[in-house]
From Swiss-Prot:
Physiological role: One of the essential components for the initiation of protein synthesis. Stabilizes the binding of IF-2 and IF-3 on the 30S subunit to which N-formylmethionyl-tRNA(fMet) subsequently binds. Helps modulate mRNA selection, yielding the 30S pre-initiation complex (PIC). Upon addition of the 50S ribosomal subunit IF-1, IF-2 and IF-3 are released leaving the mature 70S translation initiation complex.
PROSITE patterns for this protein: S1_IF1_TYPE
Main location: cytoplasm
Key words, A-Z: Cytoplasm, Initiation factor, Protein biosynthesis, RNA-binding, rRNA-binding
GO CC annotations, alphabetized: cytosol
Subunit structure: Component of the 30S ribosomal translation pre-initiation complex which assembles on the 30S ribosome in the order IF-2 and IF-3, IF-1 and N-formylmethionyl-tRNA(fMet); mRNA recruitment can occur at any time during PIC assembly.
Protein name: Translation initiation factor IF-1
Amino acid sequence: MSKDDLIQFTGTILELLPNATFRVKLENDHGIIAHTSGRMRKNRIRILLGDKVTVEMTPYDLTKGRVIHRH
């Protein structure tokens, strides 16, 4: 799967879960579970409750995603 196949959405952090995982509400009112990307972990970027984030998802599983940017 190439990077072109990934879908990006904007959402809001609703809940902080263990192991750098978050419950995110997308702009289209869908809820997903997302984890932080490796680059965000490496640079120790903190994500807090209520933050606006960009989530990257695969078209094969629309219930899981990866947080790639914090606004």
